[in-house]
Amino acid sequence: MSPEDPQETQPLLRPPEARTPRGRRVFLASFAAALGPLSFGFALGYSSPAIPSLRRTAPPALRLGDNAASWFGAVVTLGAAAGGILGGWLLDRAGRKLSLLLCTVPFVTGFAVITAARDVWMLLGGRLLTGLACGVASLVAPVYISEIAYPAVRGLLGSCVQLMVVTGILLAYVAGWVLEWRWLAVLGCVPPTLMLLLMCYMPETPRFLLTQHQYQEAMAALRFLWGSEEGWEEPPVGAEHQGFQLALLRRPGIYKPLIIGISLMVFQQLSGVNAIMFYANSIFEEAKFKDSSLASVTVGIIQVLFTAVAALIMDRAGRRLLLALSGVIMVFSMSAFGTYFKLTQSLPSNSSHVGLVPIAAEPVDVQVGLAWLAVGSMCLFIAGFAVGWGPIPWLLMSEIFPLHVKGVATGICVLTNWFMAFLVTKEFSSVMEMLRPYGAFWLTAAFCALSVLFTLTVVPETKGRTLEQVTAHFEGR
């Protein structure tokens, strides 16, 4: 065994085959960390009720025009892309716990700036700050949870990251019914504040502590999280933290998971989910549902329910099966949604949203049928996304990278995800103008089909494996 080999010197924390940890505090620690994803879910969902509220106001009150509204929805993803870079840097230097604590600062500050906004630039600045926090939380929370969880529950706890994201989105939708945009921003300060309080009492991950040569602290963390360190294999004495070097990209244990991680994030965003969630109210308004806010809340409830189902079956069904099933469902649902717009393309429209067609011009029986096609395909897409392509890319990102490159590698993946989210969100309307709405949704269906092929041919199964066994798989050991 060579002490210079980072693969051989990283800590091995895994229980023996005959014993499974039963500590319950790991669930409390995971909940505390998952309040970060809850916060960034709220930040994502905030734009949906806030934009209509800000566009309804009359001068001299603060009001958003069309271009400013587009940036208000999209700028959070730019901040999140920068947050992905910052989070990758913090992850290996400040540690997992401190990184989560630090990300509460831009969350609270950003929502406070929005609350006090007197002009559009303050609104955009506040959104940029919350986006920065979103990027850090979306990277650090999955890593923290995957490193404190034992294999038997890692899929369940890791899926709770996405569950908290969609819960945050739903919370923003529901609160948007009764709260004006300023008070809605005040509510956005609550989850990160609660995370700050809870995380102060949670331990650093044992794996990170071992890279810092803090053996006693690592064992204390194990006892706190799992109830006892008894039965666990003693990690190698020479375990130490190794920095990222470009030469490491020649190793299959590095470049293979990096390609997979980046591809997962690209396919997740090309499914069109963020465009749909950012413009949920507008899309349902164009479909002529009487209460578009109610339709958006319905979508949020479906997303929460099916993400919860995915979390419960993740460690039984496995990652690959759920990804493939999710992709197939999204192909059919987006194809159907595109068909809805194709059937209505020749009708006159008074819409201001890229020529989307009101179904009210049709006879009543046709109108009802088309309305059900629209809402049915949208809900089917959300359900399909929630059981696979919603939670699993984040879960796999936290599982497939070796400890010594996790900060840089996950940072690259998160940067990719949020940059793609910005492009899709900002340019979705332009694509709909260029290809027509039906063409835009059929294009997303094609990307979903490619994601199924990618899953079946490239993505490995990590169910039931320790993080070290996953690394060994990529190394061919």
Swiss-Prot record:
Q: Which GO terms describe its molecular function?
A: D-glucose binding; D-glucose transmembrane transporter activity; dehydroascorbic acid transmembrane transporter activity; fructose transmembrane transporter activity; fructose uniporter activity; galactose transmembrane transporter activity
Going by the UniProt annotation, this protein carries glycans at 350
| Chief localisation class | membrane
Its membrane topology: Multi-pass membrane protein
Q: Which residues lie on this side of the membrane: Cytoplasmic?
A: 1-25, 92-96, 149-156, 204-257, 315-320, 389-404, 460-477
Q: Which Gene3D superfamilies match?
A: MFS general substrate transporter like domains
What is the annotated tissue distribution of the protein whose record heads this document?
Highest level of expression in placenta and testis. Highly expressed in adult and pubertal testis, but not prepubertal testis. Lower levels of expression in brain, liver, heart, kidney, fat and skeletal muscle.
Residues reported in the UniProt entry to bind D-glucose: 162, 268-269, 274, 394
> Which conditions up-regulate this protein?
Inhibited under glucose deprivation.
Q: Which family does it belong to?
A: Belongs to the major facilitator superfamily. Sugar transporter (TC 2.A.1.1) family. Glucose transporter subfamily.
Its assembly, as annotated, is:
Interacts with AP2B1. Also able to mediate the transport of dehydroascorbate.
NCBIfam families, sorted: SP (TIGR00879)
Mind telling me what this protein is named?
A: Solute carrier family 2, facilitated glucose transporter member 8
UniProt source species: Mus musculus (Mouse)
What phylogenetic lineage does the species belong to?
Answer: Eukaryota, Metazoa, Chordata, Craniata, Vertebrata
**Which gene codes for it?**
Slc2a8
